């Protein structure tokens, strides 16, 4: 198939590429610079699917990696939008089909179908700043006044869009608040016993005396003209869902570690509802707001006929009985039509749905989101289909816009510009043979216990098809969450080699301890038949091979850190090696054993000497070296958790090999990496965890933000080798972005100036 494609006329290739781009972006306004996300799609946990009450083709989904997604065509295409943090719920206006709400760091509202978002709460005029000094640069809007504090649930009045109900406050003093002016001002109505997770307005109640239902972990609170009534839940609940039918009281479904519970009288009384079989664990549950007799529940470890199953069950009689409409074991169910994830990793990889939603207009339409996918049924569960990826050809897949993958680099085969690779977390290495139009898993031969993450690859510039990869079971390094409670000496991983362009791999690890191998560097001056390679082993140090990776030796002479967090390597044009040691503290301290470090070697890693760091900096993350001036160094630094914005982070420049430093970018203090344009050393790029990517055209002295890119957690910018005005940007949870650097300077997604990124 690939060979036949390569012989097609160029016009057909161009048409096909344009067709793919138009199909994937035609429903949405173009971002500045034409930025779009590439890759196979899916790959990470998705949450909070929410279907519009006006148009069932419009659906919102969030993830745990800060991106949010919207479709207007029933999942055929999605657009990512970014609100500077993880969205924990969506609410559609029941009267205006263009208006919707999302709660992330604050409460946001879109009035144009999800294209642009305005901050509703806190009021933009009350915003005094943004605190983001933590390792993930998690954001807290600093506002004064701030009467609501944290909002945990929201509802819009069914007959008046100006009236908003919010469960808000602190954990110690939650309360119900109401706004009658579209969120401009709020009045406290009543205190609550627990923090509500969900909030519903009874559409059948009087407009001048609404009845509200608020669900917390342990109780249902009913608030109406007669005051507040509280009904205890039968157990601490994981999920809860409510619907209003023809009866006087709503039907409520809840899941807990003890099973499913159903109430037909607003929570006053509960009955247990069991799935067929035995031993089921239940997770998500959802009913249709206007068809509460129908509900779907996510389950696993259900034993039927001696076998264990997972999937989704459905009731059409308020839990009197359940039918298993998605039933899988190790073998994929015939009625579940997944994309590449089941094909590559098996039926259990994504697990049973984390969240479910059911259309309030049509109880046969439901979505389920899991650890890597969004799945859809339009026939009441008779069939389920993936809506995160589509097959492009016999071997490749392309994203539909739902991308929740962490990427470290995009890599281009020096002998074939159409062959590209993305190094991913959780799903390992992916390969494209058609210039990025489609992608396929490329980890055949990698040991199973290493397959989770491919951190980096390197090509032999003289031997077609020869390449090396560094892999690990441990993902997301160097983030502290990965080593906070786990010994780095227990990490699994190492080096693999391919001689057929990444199609097949063999372990190439002799002499190397199992390690979280995070970077690999090839000395281009070494003999072709005896390539010199260097590897950063996180928690081990630096390994060197002088025989093309067949054998390795640890080279830590001069490195003083115990279990050094070896993270990145760099080599100057003069042959000097640099090793970046990641910080192993997260409390904001400095001047102790937790500091990161920079080392230099002038004898091929046989001996290492420390390089001074900028004052107040101990969290270095990347290093770039000017190819024409080997003493000109650019340091990417990660802020310490002190102050409002974090201290010691940004970009620093040394013109004397690290003897002294000056800061050249301060406004972004969580910089992941700096890269140099291989075609012009005057041009540099940088990115990090503050919703921005940066460009300098004067050797790093001044920086401007690249318009169009606004994913919260960026990794690195990689220039497009075929189009000098375009770049790729890898991310922590948003796959790979591709677009032009000279896009129109206007906001993308966020329409509130005080919270536009990069200020």
List the predicted regions and their residue ranges:
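Extracellular glycan-interacting surfaces
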Residues: 14, 19-20, 24, 28-759
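Bacterial N-terminal signal peptides that target proteins for export
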Residues: 4-17
């Amino acid at each position: 198939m690939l060979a036949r494609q390569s012989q097609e006329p160029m016009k057909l290739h161009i048409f096909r590429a344009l067709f793919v781009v138009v199909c994937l972006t035609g429903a949405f306004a173009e971002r500045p610079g034409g930025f779009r996300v590439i890759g196979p799609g899916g790959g990470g946990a998705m949450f909070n699917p929410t279907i519009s009450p006006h148009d069932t083709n419009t659906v919102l989904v969030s993830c745990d990696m800060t991106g949010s997604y919207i479709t207007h065509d029933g999942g055929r295409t999605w657009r990512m939008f970014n609100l500077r943090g993880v969205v924990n719920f969506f609410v559609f206006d029941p009267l205006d089909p263009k208006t919707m709400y999302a709660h992330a760091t604050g409460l946001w509202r879109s009035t144009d179908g999800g294209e642009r978002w305005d901050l509703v709460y806190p009021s933009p005029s009350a915003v005094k700043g943004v605190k983001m000094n933590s390792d993930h640069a998690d954001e807290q809007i600093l506002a004064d006044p701030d009467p609501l504090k944290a909002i945990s649930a929201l509802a819009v009045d069914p007959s008046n869009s100006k009236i908003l109900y919010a469960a808000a406050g602190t954990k110690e003093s939650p309360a119900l608040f109401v706004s009658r002016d579209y969120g401009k001002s709020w009045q406290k109505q009543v205190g609550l016993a627990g923090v509500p997770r969900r909030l519903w307005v009874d559409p059948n109640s009087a407009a001048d005396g609404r009845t509200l239902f608020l669900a917390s972990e342990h109780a249902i609170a009913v608030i109406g003209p007669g005051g507040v009534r509280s009904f205890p839940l039968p157990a601490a609940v994981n999920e809860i869902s409510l619907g209003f039918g023809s009866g006087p009281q709503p039907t409520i479904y809840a899941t807990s570690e003890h099973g499913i519970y159903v109430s037909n009288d607003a929570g006053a009384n509960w009955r247990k509802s069991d799935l067929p079989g035995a031993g089921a664990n239940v997770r998500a549950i959802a009913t249709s707001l206007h068809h509460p007799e129908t509900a779907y529940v996510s389950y696993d470890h259900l034993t039927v006929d001696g076998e264990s199953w997972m999937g989704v069950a459905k009731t059409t009689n308020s839990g009197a009985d359940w039918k298993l409409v998605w039933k899988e074991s190790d073998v994929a169910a015939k009625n579940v039509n997944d994309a590449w994830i089941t094909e590559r990793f098996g039926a259990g990889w994504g697990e049973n749905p984390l969240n479910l939603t059911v259309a309030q207009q049509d109880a046969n339409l439901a979505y389920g989101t899991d650890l890597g996918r969004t799945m859809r049924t339009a026939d009441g569960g008779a069939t389920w289909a993936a809506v995160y990826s589509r097959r492009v050809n016999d071997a490749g897949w392309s994203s539909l816009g739902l991308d929740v993958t962490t990427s470290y680099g995009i890599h281009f085969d020096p002998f074939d510009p159409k062959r590209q690779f993305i190094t991913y977390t959780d799903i390992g290495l992916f390969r494209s043979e058609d210039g990025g139009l489609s992608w396929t898993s490329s980890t055949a031969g990698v040991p199973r216990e290493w397959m989770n993450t491919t951190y980096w690859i390197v090509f032999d510039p003289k031997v077609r098809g020869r390449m090396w990869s560094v892999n690990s079971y441990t993902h997301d390094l160097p983030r502290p969450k990965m080593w906070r409670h786990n010994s780095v000496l227990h990490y699994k991983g190492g080096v693999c080699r391919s001689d057929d362009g990444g199609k097949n791999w063999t372990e190439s690890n002799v002499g190397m301890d199992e390690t979280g191998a995070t970077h690999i560097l090839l000395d281009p001056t070494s003999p072709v038949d005896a390539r010199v390679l260097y590897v950063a082993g996180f928690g081990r140090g630096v390994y060197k091979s002088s025989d093309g990776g067949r054998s390795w030796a640890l080279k830590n002479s001069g490195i003083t850190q115990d279990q050094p967090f070896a993270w990145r390597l760099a080599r100057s044009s003069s042959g000097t090696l640099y090793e970046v040691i990641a910080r192993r503290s997260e409390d904001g301290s400095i001047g102790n054993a937790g500091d990161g470090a920079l080392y230099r070697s002038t004898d091929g890693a046989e001996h290492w000497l420390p390089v001074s760091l900028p004052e107040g900096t101990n969290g270095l993350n990347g290093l770039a070296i000017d190819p024409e001036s080997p003493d000109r160094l650019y340091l990417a630094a990660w802020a310490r958790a002190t102050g409002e914005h974090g201290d010691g982070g940004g970009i620093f420049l040394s013109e004397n090999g690290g003897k002294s430093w000056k800061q050249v970018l301060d406004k972004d203090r969580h910089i992941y990496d700096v890269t140099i344009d291989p075609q012009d050393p005057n041009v540099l790029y940088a990115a990090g965890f503050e919703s921005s990517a940066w460009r300098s055209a004067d050797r790093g002295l001044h920086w401007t933000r690249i318009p169009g890119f606004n994913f919260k957690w960026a990794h690195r910018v990689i220039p497009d080798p075929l189009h000098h005005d375009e770049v790729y940007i890898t991310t922590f949870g948003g796959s790979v972005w591709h677009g032009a650097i000279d896009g129109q300077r206007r906001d993308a997604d966020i329409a509130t100036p005080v919270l536009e990124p990069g200020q």
